[in-house]
Structures are given as structure tokens and as C-alpha cells.
Amino acid sequence: MRDPAFPGAAMAYHPFHAPRPADFPMSAFLAAAQPSFFPALTLPPAALGKPLSDPSLAGAAEAGLHLSALGHHHQAAHLRSLKSLEPEEEVDDDPKVNLEAKELWDQFHKIGTEMVITKSGRRMFPPFKVRVSGLDKKAKYILLMDIVAADDCRYKFHNSRWMVAGKADPEMPKRMYIHPDSPATGEQWMAKPVAFHKLKLTNNISDKHGFTILNSMHKYQPRFHIVRANDILKLPYSTFRTYVFPETDFIAVTAYQNDKITQLKIDHNPFAKGFRDTGNGRREKRKQLSLPSLRMYEEQCKADRDGAESDASSCDPAPGRDSLHSPLSAAPSPLRLHRTNREEKFGADSDQELDRREVRSARGHSPVGHRSPPSSPRLEDRGKDKSTPEKKSDSPESRKDGGSGGDSLFNSIRSLEKDKVESRRKEDSKSDPECGSLSKETYSPLMVQTESPPHLSASHLQSLAFSGLHGQQFFNPLNAGQPLFFHPGQFTMGPGAFSAMGMGHLLASMTGAGALDNGSLSSVQGASGAATPFPFHLSQHMLASQGIPMPAFGGLFPYPYTYMAAAAAAASAMPATSAATTMPRNPFLSSTRPRLRFNPYQIPVGIPPCSNLLTTGMPGSINPGSESSKPGSSRESSPIPDTPGHKRSHSKSLSPKASMKDSINELQRIQRLVSGLERQREVSPGRESPK
């Protein structure tokens, strides 16, 4: 029920001593409005009468307060003596109330004030704030407010103005908002303006937070009440002095209807950031990053910072994230690459360019987070091949054409090796066409290393019983310091060598076992066309002299035997032909991705910088200063930098005087194996390794 208001007065004052029960049901005061004080307090309408003077009647009213509902822990605190519930002695006061920010309220009122209501509750703007005067300084007062319907109409905003759209909806439960400082003395209330800025409006009829419940598209009038009482329990039978300010009426909406109201809120409310074009929030920062000028600036800064680095190196994961990488994942996840790429390159040209960078970086770089220097030949070559279409790394053509980019590759090798590389490249162009399937780094030492691009193509590594090893951390037992170097032409392995070390069935299970039965395994040294024998079964005392601990079963693999040989033991019992024919059907053995899902501990044993396992044990074209041994190379993630002593440890180059007949025989065997494996690969091209 709306209280009468006097339009000509700046302050409407209407005291009423005996309100009807429908005006102020006690549930509006206590049941929901102040749950922390009165969780389940209900009062009958009769309790809203005049102050009780008879002590017996006061006791009856106290019994009607249902104090038992307050819980046992509240009973002692809220039980009042009859004297405390008696009215206070009469105090001569004449309260006067003035509305704060009246000019701002008038601006809103001329246009038609709107207040947004939400399910979670929304504060009012302008906030309801008044200044009180004329109170007794010593007496205690309770200040509260409520919001009641201004009329019984429903409204709609049509043709830039509010119009009556019909009869009002059923009224929501009435709730009184008691100021949190109540009760307080008149002196305290008059010292500063009384603000109800914490009052929240909601349209949730089942609200449990004590918010004021309103209907959308209805007009409401806030009311301010002063009650002289020293206890909230006296509210039901105390005198209310109600003050109504007509300029504070508003229409409750779920979204602003009038653009002028929206602009007024933006101009005067410092918290109305949701409507502003500029701000410090995430939404505004996202808009700023999408501006073309800022995108160009981001690209320019990125280019200046990266210099000549390729796209793949800019897609490297952050160093903080590298410590969490498992060393057995063959390539970083494209999803992770996509996310980091979008985080680091806001100014990417298009989604198509992003996809190309993902594929290129997933093919070519090690996820161990070391950035490659601009002088890395593989990155330079990749940068020159940007304009060419993407090659499918799984197709046989791309593997056979792996050596076609040799001209552009060796142009960027350091000046110390130019002559040697030029001579090798010329000899390579004259060699057998099958040798072209060797990758671009054929003549660099074969680092038995993890997750790096293979020094041999996938087809040759399969023929060498290394299909599961060329992309995985398998041969790096120290995982730090200088890696083990094996030149492609420097191991000639017979089945006896593997069985002597306890690894025959292991390597036989990883690829077709026919390679082991055909005699000694060797790769082709493209420079001379000859294979140089190097005994693979290194003695334990030789490895111990280099500071390399040998595992229990005598092999070079530093991992527990049960991890690797459990699945391989069954495969070793099969014939060579059956192992070769059933291999493509088994995803564990067919794919070139890593199979062994264990995470070995790093062995903190370092190799002396001046002594190398292969500089003393094997003669070969191993140049420790070559591109494979650069600490920042894209194929090596060794955290130990090169030392001058390591760079000075040169060995004599190999004399190409091996038997041509042996090399031709080995080449023919490898060619037969490659052709057979290629046919098997084409039968099942989409096979993926188990996750």
C-alpha cells in the first residue's frame, strides 16, 4: 500500500501510530529480511498494535513472539524482562530528513528512473542516501527502509516512453531492510548521512539472502522509516515515522530500456564498466588487442624480438612448462602448440597460417624447450621452404625425397666446415638414387638422442631395427652432457652382437626380424658408398672407462629390463617371417612413435669433456664442432654447453677403402627391406600408436 505523498514538499512526513496489519506484516521485518538475527521469527498481526502498558499483556505479546523458534542458543540472549519491553519515556524530538544527491535523482526522475534487478541481486544507483536531523542525541533509533509498489499497473517502454501495459502482477513478499548500524543513538545517526547502498534488488521469489524482491516492468517507491527503539524486538509495537521522496520512484527492469538512462548511469556511476568502450577489464583488453594498429605493432615487436628465428622455434613451449614434459612423447601435442601459439602470436595473419605453423613445428622440433639459434641449418632450410606446399611426412614420397633440399641446407653451415660439406655433398649427388632417402643430416654423426628429427629417414631406421628408437629418448643413457654419437656408417651389427648383450629379442620385436637374419646390419655411408664396420658389442670395461654405468643385463639401454622386454619376449619366440608379417597389425610394433611409456630417472653421471666414447673407440667422420653437437641446435637438448676441450677433440676422417662388394650387398638388402616396409605402411597408413 502506497503512503500518501505531498507533491509540493521536498520532504513528505506522515506519522501513523496504528498501522493496519496488511501494511507491515512482521514477516517483512524479521522472517526473511534479517536472517542472521531472526531465522524463523513470526509475529501475529495483533502484535502491531499500540505500545502495551499492561505488564501481563506485554508478557502475552512476548509469548507470541515464538522465541522457541530462535533455537536454544538464542533463547538466553533474547529473553527480555518485562521492564525492557516497556516503552521508553517520552522524548521530545522532531526528526527531519533530507534526500542526499537530490539533483541527480531529479535528473533520473525527469527521464524515468530504471533500476536493474537480477536473480543474484543488484544494488541501486543512485543509492538511497538521506541526512537526518532533529533526533534526540541520547535516545536510540532504528532506521530502515522498504520498497513498495507505486501503483497497480504494469509498464512497457514504447516509442521512447513508458506506457501502461496492463494490470500489475501479484505482489512479491514485502521485506524491510534494517540499516546494519541499528540501533544507534540520535547523535550517531546525525553525524553523517545514512546510506542504504547495500540494499539489493532481485526478481528471485525464493531468495534466501534478504534481498528486496520486485517484479520487472513495475513501478516502485522507496520509503524511509525512523523508529525510536533500543531493541529490534520492539519494532512490532513501536511508532514508525515514514518519509517518502517522490523523485526516488523507479521502474524495475531486467535490462535498461531507455538509452538516456544508460548514459546517465555511465556518466555518474564509477562502477558501470560494462557499458564503457574503454576500461581496464578483460573485455576491453581483448578489444584493444583486436585493433589493426595494435596487431601490426605486436607483429613488429615479435619480429624484432625473434630476429631470424623460424616459426617453429617461436612455437616452443615456455621454459616453465618444459620441466613437466615427459621425455617419451614423440612430438608436442598439437593442442598445446595451438594454445601457446595463440598466446604468443596475437597478430597471426590467419587461421590457415596458424595451422601451417603447427604442422611444421610438430614435424620438426624437439619439445625440450631450447630455442634454436638463427644459424641452425635445419631452421634456415625450413624458412626457405615456407612458400612450398606442406609435405605429408607419412607418405613414401616425402621420405624418399628427404635429401632433395641438400643444396639449400649446406649453404648456412659454419665456415669451419664448408669445404668438407661441399665435398660430401658433391659425392652424395653422384651416389646411388636409393641413398637419396637418407635425410639431410646424413653425414652428421648419428646422435642416439631423443625426440629429435631422425638422422636417417624412417624407412632406413626401420631397416636398421630402430623404428621405435629414432624419435625417442632411448639411446641417451645419461640424458645430460655429451650424447653418444654413432655415425650411420659405423655400426655393423650381427644377431650375435644383440644376443650377446641380451637385446636380440628386443630389437627383433621392434621391427621385422629379417634384418637380423640377413647377416650384419649396416647403413650406407653416402660419401664413399662403403660401410665401415664398427663392432656394436662394446665391452663393459670400455664403457666403464668412459664413465658410463652399464645396466644389469649388459646392454646400452639404461632402463630396467622388465620395462622393455616384457612385450618383446613373446615376439622373440616367433619366426622371423611371422614377426615381419604380423608387425603392421600390431600398433605397438608398427608405428614409428615411441612405444615404451615409462619415465626413467636421469643418471647424474657426466662424461669428461675431453674424452668421448667414440673418439677413442671408433674412427669416423665425427666432428664434435659440427652442427649436431651445437648446444643450441634444434636436434639436441643437452643442458651442458660445449667446452673448448670438447671442441678440440678431433679425430681422423675415415679412409673410404672398404669393400665395394659388401656395400653393394648391404645396399640391396636395405633396398628390399625398405620396399617391403613401404608396402606394409601403405596398407595401413592411419595407424596411430596407443596413447
UniProtKB/Swiss-Prot annotation:
DNA-binding region: 104-277
GO molecular function: DNA-binding transcription factor activity, RNA polymerase II-specific; RNA polymerase II cis-regulatory region sequence-specific DNA binding
Key word Coiled coil present: yes
SUPFAM superfamilies referenced in this protein's UniProt entry, alphabetically: p53-like transcription factors
Composition skew (Low complexity), residue ranges: 325-335, 624-639
Subunit-structure text: Binds DNA as a monomer.
PANTHER family named in the record: T-BOX PROTEIN-RELATED (PTHR11267), T-BOX TRANSCRIPTION FACTOR TBX2 (PTHR11267:SF82)
Protein name, per record: T-box transcription factor TBX2-B
Name of the encoding gene: tbx2-b
